[in-house]
Swiss-Prot record:
Keywords: Cytoplasm, Ribonucleoprotein, Ribosomal protein. Transmembrane segments: none annotated. Its main location: cytoplasm. This is Large ribosomal subunit protein uL3y. PROSITE patterns: RIBOSOMAL_L3. It comes from the Eukaryota. GO terms for cellular component: cytosolic large ribosomal subunit; nucleus. One of its GO terms (molecular function) is structural constituent of ribosome. InterPro entries: L3_arc_euk (IPR045077), Ribosomal_L3_dom_3_arc_sf (IPR044892), Ribosomal_uL3 (IPR000597), Ribosomal_uL3_CS (IPR019926), Transl_B-barrel_sf (IPR009000). GO terms for biological process: translation. It is found in: Cytoplasm. The keyword ATP-binding does not apply. It comes from Arabidopsis thaliana (Mouse-ear cress). Residues 1-36 are annotated as: Disordered.
Length: 390
């Protein structure tokens, strides 16, 4: 930037360094919403699988705006969220160096899809994970030991989290057999109530509508789509050099002065792009779809056409959404089938956008495999008429 007579911000943010591959495939919750002991006990996060995107039409509720009561078309993401199963509870104590886990109590019966998570190769293993621990629940001595650990949690711990896993076998579009295991913090009530609440959920299914509601703002944590090794122009957005540049033009011309005799970390360099851990905040829930209810279909108050939320031909590279789902405004991190962590928002929402009530008029169910024209197969058959097989 020598001899430049105007201000120019640098290309690319340094706030996301280092730009390297994420250490884990599943999004990690690094902060939970602030606890309020006066409220009843509740869970604060959930796991889902990204299915794909579609678009909706709705009326804007914004009094005073020119757009008030006008139709708008918006992109939405469908995240399939089958019920999670609670299998354990963890207690944390506060130390000068942060939270430290005191003890963990597991449920008696753990499914095979969860036990697969503790093996690198399930087929060649002895499949004995938790067999000794589950016998604790059958003997008097073991029950006393478990009860003493729970009492220790009530006495010393300040944070209680449950261990819950996804039901991966219900995800027919995924070939994976290992369930994803996650810690979910319990907020509300005192510590004793939290421990009792966690124990009451052991081996039970927790649906997504027990945590998130329609029109709520949530955060999405996940790992972005991987791009591999990329150059500086794609990775950092720096300007291409002139056409006649010697030895390449999609480069940084000068990577630093002679002294200091090293390359600064702030200089744009080629390297890994994508597969980064990211948190997207304030995504509005447009619909919570429940299996067996009208909300699972793409029907609305204005559009009574009987059609499923899955577009014609299924979501590309995913398939059919058969379980509960969340409809989120806008896009979300990761490719299709990627597991994403859904978390309640950290801050109290007061903006007009967050408080707006969403009334969907139309949900598109046309094929995503091209320029889809038809919402249902019956509509397509009616348009083309009777087909004659050769």
């Amino acid at each position: 930037m020598s001899h430049r007579k105007f201000e120019h911000p640098r290309h690319g943010s340094l706030g996301f360094l280092p730009r390297k591959r994420a250490s884990r495939h599943r999004g990690k919750v690094k902060a939970f919403p602030k606890d309020d002991p006066t409220k009843p006990c509740r869970l604060t996060s959930f796991l889902g699988y990204k299915a794909g995107m579609t678009h909706i039409v709705r009326d804007v509720e914004k009094p005073g705006s020119k757009l008030h009561k006008k139709e708008t078309c918006e992109a939405v993401t469908i995240i399939e969220t089958p019920p999670m199963v609670v299998v354990g509870v963890v207690g944390y104590v506060k130390t000068p160096r942060g939270l430290r886990s005191l003890c963990t109590v597991w449920a008696q019966h753990l499914s095979e899809e969860l036990r697969r998570r503790f093996y690198k190769n399930w087929a060649k293993s002895k499949k004995k994970a938790f067999t000794r621990y589950s016998k604790k629940h059958e003997t008097e001595e073991g029950k006393k030991d478990i009860q003493s650990q729970l009492e220790k949690m009530k006495k010393y711990c300040s944070v209680i989290r449950v261990l819950a896993h996804t039901q991966i076998r219900k995800m027919k579009g995924l070939k994976q057999k290992k369930a994803h295991l996650n810690e979910i913090q319990i907020n509300g009530g005192d510590i004793a109530k939290k421990v009792d609440y966690a124990c009451s959920l052991f081996e039970k299914q927790v649906p997504v509508d027990a945590i998130f509601q329609k029109d709520e703002m949530i955060d999405i944590i996940g790992v972005t789509k991987g791009k591999g090794y990329e150059g500086v122009v794609t990775r950092w957005g720096v300007t291409r050099l002139p056409r006649k540049t010697h030895r390449g033009l999609r480069k940084v011309a000068c990577i630093g002065a002679w002294h200091p005799a090293r390359v600064s970390y702030t200089v744009a360099r080629a390297g890994q792009n994508g597969y980064h851990h990211r948190t997207e905040m304030n995504k509005k829930v447009y619909r919570v779809g429940k299996v067996g209810q009208e909300t699972h279909s793409a029907m609305t108050e204005y559009d009574r056409t009987e059609k499923d939320i899955t577009p014609m031909g299924g979501f590309p590279h995913y398939g059919i959404v058969k379980e509960d789902y969340l409809m989120i405004k806008g896009c979300c991190v990761g490719p299709k089938k990627r597991v994403v962590t859904l978390r309640q928002t950290l801050l109290k929402q007061t903006s007009r956008l967050a408080m707006e009530e969403i009334k969907l008029k139309f949900i598109d169910a046309a094929s995503n495999g091209g320029h889809g024209r038809f919402q249902t197969s019956q509509e397509k058959a009616k348009f083309y008429g009777r087909t004659i097989k050769a």
